[in-house]
């Protein structure tokens, strides 16, 4: 009498939230690069990190960019950005809708609103 065991392996994606954290970290540490042409080639042959006197190539795991992102805080008709001035923000939020981040360090005015509505309460 013998026994047989079967093992099945598979790859799964990480939880969406974990993936978001990894991408956000990569975004915060992204490296600006510039294309470099070998002497005889017309097309760029590789990318190098864009720093004075730097000849380092980015690592395969680096998130890289060639041009800096536009400033979304200020209005820019060229990119179509309307900026953040005059938008409502959430004073207590820590993410993109929070006043500290959305107002780009310019400061903000606070307004307190009261709202009355019927709640169909029964006592």
Curated annotation (Swiss-Prot):
<dbReference type="GO" id="GO:0045165">
    <property type="term" value="P:cell fate commitment"/>
</dbReference>
<keyword id="KW-0272">Extracellular matrix</keyword>
<keyword id="KW-1015">Disulfide bond</keyword>
<dbReference type="InterPro" id="IPR043158">
    <property type="entry name" value="Wnt_C"/>
</dbReference>
<feature type="region of interest" description="Disordered linker">
    <location>
        <begin position="33"/>
        <end position="61"/>
    </location>
</feature>
<comment type="function">
    <text>Ligand for members of the frizzled family of seven transmembrane receptors that functions in the canonical Wnt/beta-catenin signaling pathway. Plays an important role in embryonic development, including dorsal versus ventral patterning during limb development, skeleton development and urogenital tract development. Required for central nervous system (CNS) angiogenesis and blood-brain barrier regulation.</text>
</comment>
<keyword id="KW-0879">Wnt signaling pathway</keyword>
<dbReference type="GO" id="GO:0005615">
    <property type="term" value="C:extracellular space"/>
</dbReference>
<keyword id="KW-0325">Glycoprotein</keyword>
<keyword id="KW-0449">Lipoprotein</keyword>
<dbReference type="GO" id="GO:0030182">
    <property type="term" value="P:neuron differentiation"/>
</dbReference>
<feature type="disulfide bond">
    <location>
        <begin position="89"/>
        <end position="104"/>
    </location>
</feature>
<dbReference type="GO" id="GO:0048513">
    <property type="term" value="P:animal organ development"/>
</dbReference>
<dbReference type="InterPro" id="IPR005817">
    <property type="entry name" value="Wnt"/>
</dbReference>
<keyword id="KW-0217">Developmental protein</keyword>
<keyword id="KW-0964">Secreted</keyword>
<feature type="glycosylation site" description="N-linked (GlcNAc...) asparagine">
    <location>
        <position position="90"/>
    </location>
</feature>
<feature type="lipid moiety-binding region" description="O-palmitoleoyl serine; by PORCN">
    <location>
        <position position="1"/>
    </location>
</feature>
<dbReference type="GO" id="GO:0046330">
    <property type="term" value="P:positive regulation of JNK cascade"/>
</dbReference>
<dbReference type="GO" id="GO:0005125">
    <property type="term" value="F:cytokine activity"/>
</dbReference>
<dbReference type="Pfam" id="PF00110">
    <property type="entry name" value="wnt"/>
</dbReference>
<dbReference type="GO" id="GO:0005109">
    <property type="term" value="F:frizzled binding"/>
</dbReference>
<comment type="similarity">
    <text>Belongs to the Wnt family.</text>
</comment>
<protein>
    <recommendedName>
        <fullName>Protein Wnt-7a</fullName>
    </recommendedName>
</protein>
<dbReference type="InterPro" id="IPR013300">
    <property type="entry name" value="Wnt7"/>
</dbReference>
<dbReference type="GO" id="GO:0060070">
    <property type="term" value="P:canonical Wnt signaling pathway"/>
</dbReference>
